[in-house]
Design a protein with these regions (language model features):
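Structural and coupling elements of P-loop NTPases
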Residues: 1-693
Length: 693
């Protein structure tokens, strides 16, 4: 069934891990008849947590789409992970959604996940509800949670639903503040009850607060309010809807997903108060000439869709899209704005968890999936050839956690690379680099949990087991003293022999990293035709320094004397002689290890500044400055040796309760302090010994 854009709601569920987002989605599906039995995360049978990794870990690790129908509207629920390693999935869902429901637990109050979700919405000017979950569980405290929300986010927080307690402080029902009606659940069915004694005054207070919010949405309503006239129900809905859209009102609802308490009221408010796709996020598009323009969501426009997510598994590839203009149909030719290539659409589907239902079309504003679009990737814009525009790519955070990945069985490096490449189609937030210098395949991600999931999927989906090891630091070596040495190579094994003799002066230089080769030979002691062989031998030798085998930089080598044999001198002999001179000279040239140093920018709340700066000092970091961001955070700029950054992503998360974030980029090489140099040399020699076994 196709829905008009006015009757579509695209809503993402955000919040801290474990606060009940997936359970809420399950409850909404059940109450609308989309499923006939509610699953449980502990049983591994929910609609949205269908991946084997989610079942095993009992957490969400990817965004799932769960469409349902209610009161003539199609509601596309996007259930997102709360674990911060999978924030990329949240970024994808936010692009497809037109509004958010931030789920927080009555047991935990204002959590880090809630704060991050709120910030995501603020950055996008996204309308939002707050849903207080688990109100009926032991140790829950709705009042404390609500007051914490008010204290954190201000008086724009407005309750639409409040719980009812019995004498033992157990939640038994809820009250609809707008309609002043009370309900309880009996066998997962909503039953209206009388408003308990003593609640009337509180409900009246909240109801009047809603009326004040409505009055502020227009002059007409303001005049009516101060004139003492009551608003009709339709006017209340109109005003509340406008307040939600204009971000002057953030309704708070509550309930329990386990027994579906509050779920129908939430559905009512989704339909009545949240925007449809034409009223949702403002989009900017880049034309082919490079100019930007506002993108207007239009049912009658040329077909345009944004690919916000990709699923690629053993059953095939699905490109999840939000239709932003026109209507999509199978076999419709569309141009990929990124590549300029035209490709016919495959079959179209609506997805409910892992269940794909084929459809004949996807209308404007709707969310669905296209099958087998092999050249399409997450972040692409698919357009009609008459109007090719590119919407802004998804703003994924840079990977901040790196490990080396190696197969448990030798020879399976290609299998690991192929498996990671397939999974990178689904999860573009991680990257893989092959470091030619350290001979490591490096996996860069958001944190240890994401990396652990990737390794687990390599085994389950691609039948290859992998180990994780620390990333080796790419040190350099240089000399600090000028030394001159002879290199003499003579080999006689019968017949023609090999002879090469050179004197080379090795000295430090600061002009460039690469070796500078020069010659000061007089009188033909070394023929010019052997100069290239000498230079080649030296450049090859520079790949391994005298201290720990790291590349040598800032070196100047001057060939100034030598001798040759008219019969036995060949290029290979002079190449070998040059390398002998190098090996003899550099250990005497006061060599030193250079370590890579990077620029670190850490964003943390003010309250964690002392801990973070103290930790940077322990990592031999130099704090260069601190800048307030204006929202209670500070950006600390520092220079830190790369060797000290291996576990920083995990350590910062622990120090700041996941409130901190950082970027780190290489800047330059610096002399390594003696203690750090000794440690690096010992590690390099131990690694070399292990590889020789």
């Amino acid at each position: 069934m196709s829905y008009s854009v006015q009757n579509i709601r695209n809503v993402c569920l955000l919040g801290h891990s474990g606060n009940g987002k997936t359970a809420l989605a399950e409850s909404l599906l059940y109450m609308t008849g989309a499923i006939d039995r509610m699953g449980r995360g502990a049983d591994g049978n929910t609609v949205c947590d269908y991946d084997p990794e989610e079942t095993k870990r009992q957490i969400s690790i990817s965004t799932a789409v769960a469409p349902l129908e209610y009161k003539g509207c199609r509601i596309n629920v996007l259930d997102t992970p709360g674990a911060f390693d999978f924030a990329g999935e949240v970024i994808e869902a936010l692009r497809a959604a037109d509004a958010a429901i931030i789920v927080c637990s009555a047991k935990d109050g204002v959590s880090v996940g809630l704060e991050k979700a709120w910030k995501y919405c603020e950055e996008r000017n996204m309308p939002r509800f707050i849903y207080i979950s688990k109100t009926d569980e032991d140790n829950s405290d709705y009042n404390a949670t609500f007051e914490a929300l008010r204290a954190r986010f201000g008086n724009k927080i407005a309750p639409l639903v409040v719980p009812i307690w019995d004498e033992g402080k157990k939640v038994t029902g809820i009250i609809d503040v707008l309609n002043k009606r009370a309900y309880e659940m009996q066998d997962q069915k909503r039953v209206e009850i009388e408003i308990p004694e003593g609640k009337d005054a509180v409900i009246e207070e909240f109801n009047n607060a809603l009326k004040e919010s409505v009055a502020e949405t227009s002059e007409e309503f303001m005049d009516k309010f101060f004139g003492g006239e009551d608003f009709t129900y339709a006017e209340m809905i109109q005003g509340l809807r406008q307040g939600v859209r204009e971000l002057s009102l953030f309704p708070v609802l509550c309930g329990s997903a386990v027994n579906c308490m509050g779920s129908l009221m939430l559905l009512d408010d989704i339909v009545d108060l949240l925007p449809n796709p034409m009223e949702g996020n403002y989009h900017k598009a880049t034309r082919q000439d490079g100019e930007t323009e506002p993108f207007v969501v239009s049912p009658g426009g040329v077909p345009t869709a944004f690919v916000f997510k990709t699923v690629s598994d053993q059953y095939g590839k699905y490109s999840f899209v939000k239709v932003l203009s026109g209507t999509l149909t199978p076999d419709l030719p569309m141009v990929n704005a990124r590549t300029g290539v035209s490709e016919k659409l495959g079959r179209l589907y609506t997805m409910r968890g892992k269940k794909a239902t084929e459809v004949k079309e996807l209308g404007c504003g709707d969310i669905g999936a296209i099958g087998k679009m092999e050249k399409v990737k997450t972040g692409d814009t698919l357009c009609d050839a008459r109007k090719v525009v590119a919407l802004k790519e998804l703003p994924f955070a840079e990977p901040c956690y790196s490990v080396a990945i190696v197969p448990k069985t030798r020879g399976q490096e290609d299998k690991i690379a192929q498996g990671l490449a397939r999974m990178n189609e689904e999860d573009p937030t991680f990257s893989v680099t092959n470091n030619a210098e350290t001979h490591q395949m490096v996996l860069n991600g958001s944190g240890d949990m994401q990396v652990d999931v990737l390794v687990s999927k390599l085994k389950s989906r691609f039948n290859v087991e992998a180990d994780l090891k620390p990333v080796r630091v790419p040190y350099r070596e240089k000399i600090r003293k000028t030394v001159q040495k002879q290199g003499r190579h003579k080999k006689q094994t019968g017949g023609s022999g090999q002879f090469g003799d050179v004197w080379i002066r090795f000295e430090p230089q600061t002009e460039q990293d690469d070796m500078i080769f020069a010659e000061e030979v007089f009188g033909g002691s070394v023929p010019k035709n052997f100069f290239p062989a000498v230079e080649k031998g030296l450049r090859e030798a520079c790949a391994h320094g005298p201290l720990a085998g790291y590349p040598v930089v800032n070196l100047k080598a001057v060939l100034y004397d030598g001798s040759y044999h008219p019969v036995d001198s060949y290029e290979i002999a002079f190449k070998t002689a040059a390398q002998l001179a190098y090996k003899a000279a550099l250990p005497e040239a006061n060599p030193v290890l250079l370590e890579p140093v990077g620029e670190l920018k850490v964003t943390v709340p003010d309250s964690y500044m002392g801990d973070v700066i103290g930790d940077l000092n322990k990592r031999r970091g130099r704090v260069m400055g601190m800048d307030p961001t204006g929202d209670g955070n500070q950006v600390i700029s520092a220079e830190v040796p790369m060797a000290e950054m291996g576990s920083y992503a995990i350590d910062l998360r622990s120090m700041t309760q996941s409130r901190g974030s950082f970027t780190f980029h290489f800047v330059r090489y610096e002399d390594c302090p003696p203690a750090a140099q000794e440690k690096a040399i010992a590690e390099a020699k131990a690694l070399q010994a292990a590889e020789e076994k």
